[in-house]
Every structure is written in C-alpha cells, then in structure tokens.
Amino acid sequence: MKTAHEIRPGNVIMLDGSPWVVQKTETTRSGRNAAIVKLKLKNVLLDSGTEQTFKGEDKLDDIILERLDCTYSYFADPMYVFMDEEYNQYDVEADNLGDAADYIIDGMEDVCQVTFYEGKAISVELPVHIVREVIYTEPSARGDTSGKVMKPATITGGGTVTVADFVKVGDKIEIDTRTGEFKKRV
C-alpha cells in the first residue's frame, strides 16, 4: 500500500477490482488543508480513462508487477518499441506513456523500466533524472533579475519545461521526470 502522495506516473494501482496505469499525477497543497492528489488513470483491461482525486494520505493498492529494464528502440505509430538486453522487443501504446512520451527521443541511452501485466507491456517508467537539449527558448530579458526568473523552453522530444532565465538554445539541461521540473544546466 502506498499513499496517494507516493504514487508516480507509470505505477499500476488497483481500483474497484481493476488494474489502472497512472499516466499523470498533480499534487495541490493549500495552506490549511491537506494535500490533494489528482491522478489521470487508464484501465489496463478496458482501455478506458478517468481522472480521480484523492487526499494525500489516502492509501492506494499498488500492484507489484513484472518489471524489466529496457532501452527505447523506435517509434512505430502508435506504438513505442523498447528492447531488453536479450534483444526482445516490447510494444507500448503511446497512450500508456502519458507525459513520458515528451522525454523519449531517438538514440536515447537511458534505461527505462517497462511494466508488464499478464504478459502485456502496459507502461514505462523513465529514470528519475534525464538530460535533454534545449531546442527553443526566448532570449533572456536584459535587466530582469528580480528573484527567480523562469521561462518556457522546448526540449528534444517536443516537451516543454520551465527553465531558469540563463538557459539558452543548445544548452543541455537535467530534468526531473517525476515532476517535469528543470534541475540544472549540464
């Protein structure tokens, strides 16, 4: 059992007797109230999706499934293909990746964990930190140094990350895949 606050994208939880893949998590904390966790879920058996809201301390039944270390191989619309050390290939539907699809690029060497349910690859968990190149961002605004200045940047793979003002096109940055936050320039 995990609390709702500990659930991450790629985890598989049991709700109402069915396994659900967590595609996205969003935590909201307010001053006096407890944290609220909003989960975007996809049913493994029925391919239906839903959003559920939980209190941060709610207990959820995390299913322990078979996991295998794999690397990304190629994209065969609408499937992402991953390969293990023995060159076995596993297809994962693009819908099951959720936000992780923004960080997957051709030639990436990051080792991912592919999760299986009844022999079918259902989700992928990326490493906690990955390095990607900034392919587009606005130039820094000269003189705007009051506090922590952030701006949007597009990274290889097509995702958008909010980065510090000093980051420019061509820089390699480290990203926390759990939250999608910029960590540092590499």
From Swiss-Prot:
Transmembrane segments: none annotated. Gene3D superfamilies: 2.30.30.30, Nucleic acid-binding proteins (2.40.50.140). InterPro entries: Elong-fact-P_C (IPR015365), NA-bd_OB-fold (IPR012340), Rib_uL2_dom2 (IPR014722), Transl_elong_fac_P/YeiP (IPR020599), Transl_elong_KOW-like (IPR013185), Transl_elong_P/YeiP_cen (IPR001059), Transl_elongation_fac_P (IPR011768), Translation_prot_SH3-like_sf (IPR008991). It is found in: Cytoplasm. Keywords: Cytoplasm, Elongation factor, Protein biosynthesis. Its main location: cytoplasm. The keyword Cytoplasm applies. GO terms for biological process: peptide biosynthetic process. Pathway: Protein biosynthesis; polypeptide chain elongation. GO terms for cellular component: cytoplasm. Belongs to the elongation factor P family. Involved in peptide bond synthesis. Stimulates efficient translation and peptide-bond synthesis on native or reconstituted 70S ribosomes in vitro. Probably functions indirectly by altering the affinity of the ribosome for aminoacyl-tRNA, thus increasing their reactivity as acceptors for peptidyl transferase. This is Elongation factor P. It comes from Shewanella frigidimarina (strain NCIMB 400).
